[in-house]
Amino acid sequence: MSEQNVSTMRNTYEAFNRADIPAVLEAFDPQIEWHEPGGGSAPQGDYHGAESVANDVFSTIPEHFDEFEARPDFFIDGSEHLVVVGAFHARSKAGHRMQARYAHVWKMRDGKAISFNNHVEAAPWAEGWSAS
């Protein structure tokens, strides 16, 4: 199942980077638990359910950024847990460029993401979200 999890999440990052949010949400359990660290005007706290992630997290991105990608460098397969290490690359509405390294920790069950934690480089993340 873990190879399937890596493939699923690789496809999910590709969908996110082309702004195909319906395809991203297909990889999530409807009751996914989601955590964002905040910083600047970035979403912060715990979100419950795919609909909340779409409405309260993803929908804020185009309000602040003209470009925004989560580019994975590698995937660490831990069976039901998957760690994705990479960097956010973005350009704010004000033209500020952001690059912030991340480690995303996913928990998977039956081929769907059931939880997500965004561990991100704090200073550039907060600065990027404040520069819109």
Which residues does each PLM region occupy?
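A beta-strand edge to alpha-helix "cap/lid" segment located at domain peripheries
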Residues: M1-Q4, F58-S132
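Hydrophobic pocket/interface hotspot
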Residues: M9-T12, V24-L25, I32, G49, ...
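Short, low-complexity N-terminal intrinsically disordered segments enriched in polar/charged residues
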Residues: M1-Q31, G128-S132
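Alpha-helical structural motif
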Residues: N5-T8, D20, V53, V57, ...
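A solvent-exposed, acidic/Ser-Thr-rich amphipathic alpha-helical stretch
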Residues: P22-L25, D29-E80
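Short, mixed-charge, low-aromatic patches
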Residues: M9-R18, S41-Q44, T60-P62, V85
